[in-house]
Amino acid sequence: MQIQSFYHSASLKTQEAFKSLQKTLYNGMQILSGQGKAPAKAPDARPEIIVLREPGATWGNYLQHQKTSNHSLHNLYNLRRDLLTVGATVLGKQDPVLTSMANQMELAKVKADRPATKQEEAAAKALKKNLIELIAARTQQQDGLPAKEAHRFAAVAFRDAQDKQLNNQPWQTIKNTLTHNGHHYTNTQLPAAEMKIGAKDIFPSAYEGKGVCSWDTKNIHHANNLWMSTVSVHEDGKDKTLFCGIRHGVLSPYHEKDPLLRQVGAENKAKEVLTAALFSKPELLNKALAGEAVSLKLVSVGLLTASNIFGKEGTMVEDQMRAWQSLTQPGKMIHLKIRNKDGDLQTVKIKPDVAAFNVGVNELALKLGFGLKASDSYNAEALYQLLGNDLRPEARPGGWVGEWLAQYPDNYEVVNTLARQIKDIWKNNQHHKDGGEPYKLAQRLAMLAHEIDAVPAWNCKSGKDRTGMMDSEIKREIISLHQTHMLSAPGSLPDSGGQKIFQKVLLNSGNPGDSEPNTGGAGNKVMKNLSPEVLNLSYQKRVGDENIWQSVKGISSLITS
């Protein structure tokens, strides 16, 4: 079928959308014959935004009159390439419109990166919608479906194909090093697929080098976006772990309509988080594999907005809390299957004890107050577990923290200070406002968990944006503590030295790379500009550098679920 004949049969709206896409052709270039698949990946782009400012510098007359965006052309190119691959999966590699688009992209590819134009940005943002419209038009042609039904089918088909593409790509360890004041810190993000004792990953349903992306929202077998995150420092000729925790997506498979399957799925995901938590404690894992029943303390910090006014995160929080409650009844022993060093499944016995928090950290929670009351009903119980029943700031800590301090450990002062800070935040409801530090309570809960030898775990809905920012805030404070031997006051903006640490962490924590296997594009949606300005969180002030803020934001604003 020729492209022109397709336009005669497609809707006017679809015609106009694809005419706009085809304007990316460069004049005088011929379209090469191709197989309708996406072109090769663009060369890697530098992490910083590059803007030419020298009088003689130019990208050609075409770009001289174009407004540039803050997005790398290579990143946009690779996003469009991945979307075309999904389209080819649904429509087949011989589709003439896909062939045309792929060839145009190949011709337009440039070796040197540059900021994209606003027109290129708009084309990238519209591509997914246009591909779904193309699939719908093809479905109408072939099956005679009504337009609305064809569009619904197309959206589901594209989503399923995209999930499979993202899940089936290699999920690999991300490791970056940063240097500050002569100290070398290594940030490591280890995906579930690489949590191994032997040649295979430890999970009974093996990941086989792959993963479960944040968009796979009906998956009832695996946790979404499950990683172990660590930061270590090289001292005295060896690496010392400063922090280790587990990050993941919400436990609720929230697009599963059957309530029983949704609950089973949430519990399966929770078991995988517990398995990952056990893996993060090698000595405890070895005891469990030797047949000993082991106790495992975990501090779970949800970052969702516990309200259904916008979205359904309130229901997701309920599903997650129900899963933790089901697995952690007092005195309950649970059996997990773990693949040992020989690759055989082995049953281990653990007694899990979970302090389950939820702390809203987005604009809906901190600027509009959504979900705060519901979250605090969970948080009060979890604080009793962690700190004892007397939550007055001046009271001696009880609970897990009291048990730890009774041993007079080397980190006594750090633990005592974190406990006091958390109590102050709770007493004054500081976690209900941005106050210059959106993650003030969540970040300190995770740090305190690590300091008392419990396992910190944290998650938002997807396990990438809010979860990634929490990861960066933890590592910022951990490195700052290692450098200054002092903890930051709650609700304080970083000073210039703290901003330098934060900037380095944001660019070298592995979080931007973690977003790519989940969505096909690197970037964090926490970085946004809302109108009116009063709705914005304090991240521009916390980061202190517009270029780095934009770099961390990446192409997240162009990606739609």
Curated annotation (Swiss-Prot):
Principal localisation: secreted
InterPro entries reported in the protein's UniProt record: IpgD/SopB (IPR008108)
Keyword rRNA-binding among record annotations: no
Name of the protein this chain belongs to: Inositol phosphate phosphatase SopB
Active site: 460
A GO molecular-function descriptor: phosphatase activity
Keyword line: Hydrolase, Secreted, Virulence
Enzyme class, spelled out: hydrolase
Organism listed in the record: Salmonella dublin
GO cellular component, one term: extracellular region
Chain's role: Converts phosphatidylinositol 3,4,5-trisphosphate (PtdIns 3,4,5-P3) to PtdIns 3-P and prevents the transition of PtdIns 3-P to PtdIns 3,5-P2. It is one of the known effectors injected by Salmonella into the host cell and is required for invasion and for an efficient generation and maintenance of Salmonella-containing vacuole (SVC). Alteration of the phosphoinositide composition of the plasma membrane causes membrane ruffling and actin cytoskeleton rearrangements.
Similarity annotation: Belongs to the phosphatase IpgD/SopB family.
Comment text on domains: Contains the consensus sequence Cys-X(5)-Arg characteristic of Mg-independent phosphatases.
EC numbers on record: 3.1.3.-
Pfam families, sorted: IpgD
Superkingdom classification of source: Bacteria
Compartments, record wording: Secreted
